[in-house]
């Protein structure tokens, strides 16, 4: 039985043709191995007499994988052409000078990255290793044999991620103190966290920051694209421009005009959208469509429902035409979303007297993002007649919320059985294209976020038959994140604290308590 020793003497085979983001993540995994064993793997570019090695590559970007497949030493057909899939194969004598190797092959960039991070998990490294400084248990060596051979699944949900929202003062002050601003140095650990959790999709912070300007310049977007993080913008920020950008460029004499008003200022607003699409067109994005008022407010607040629907219809026509001109004449090949949140939900469904946007040809191929009620209960799900919509459905879900009538933030209050109930139902009703959760400042939300993303990645495992699966999830999450620092006898107590704490907060959050509550 071939086996590979993770520890002293291990090498990482580094191809010149490897994708830059994959190389960067391989460096992170080498650091993980050093955390566990105390020894950092050596990077090699040939066999060089190495006994054991990790070989990694991406189909289409790896002569090494091509050669091994041609020689019959590895099989790639099980992952070829499959979104974000990877395989593990422990083999003997892959290259001259290498006795045994673990070959990590990815169908695409993220597949390879997930495979590399899966190696970290196999040796006991938590996805929170750097974000929360969760140190693994020391082991001199870890032996892996061909029992780790596997082919990963196609993720249950295509785009899985989170929204950094209402980020001041917590996330904002952290970014300012450690990095100076929400620049690429700040986003690097955020992207790492997302990818270690097998997410792939992000709505960046937007209260007083501009993702595509603060890198500085496009460095945030460049880094995201290098690492395979799919960027988008929140529900009220169309065409890859953050909500604060218009206030920076508006004014009398500005080419963008001085009114966030598509009726009064159509040329300026269209130019604003055009320039955003042009700026970010070379990156992997999901483009937000539609329009709300400034600062996430209702648009045309005193207009009729019919007038609002017609406005959004005209906006969609303009935005889709811009996408045809700038990105792809076949607009249906471009990932797009529209988020029906708050008052815009009525624009989609309409009323008995006024037809909504359901079935509008401008929404063909657009992912229709439904939402919860800001407090973790989904509002609507697709009917059987709606589920064939080209573009599919997504869900915008809240684990943190700043706004009326009651905010809840800065405390991780997510009760997993509630997430299970709402999101497994959403999946069963066909909401499978995008899952994104509002997690405020990220900090304190890691437990709920971990389950949300694991559920989105593999609903067959973490959806289970009923909510009892969340008890099993909590136990394994506690072992992974507290097992190195606490005695085994303490872990059930930690599980109980987390479960009871979140259960009680699900019944009554701090912000909703007053002198007359009881």
Where do the model's predicted regions map?
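Substrate-binding groove of N-acetylhexosamine-processing glycoside hydrolases
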Residues: 125, 148-151, 245, 319-518
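Flexible loop/turn segments at secondary-structure boundaries
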Residues: 19-21, 62-64, 110-112, 169-172, ...
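Contiguous, structured surface segment used for ligand recognition
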Residues: 1-153
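Gly/Pro-rich turn-and-neighbor structural signature
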Residues: 38, 135-146, 207, 215-226, ...
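An acidic-aromatic substrate-binding cleft motif
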Residues: 128-179, 185-205, 391-394
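Hydrophobic faces of well-ordered beta-strands that scaffold small-molecule active sites
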Residues: 160-164, 195, 201-204, 231-235, ...
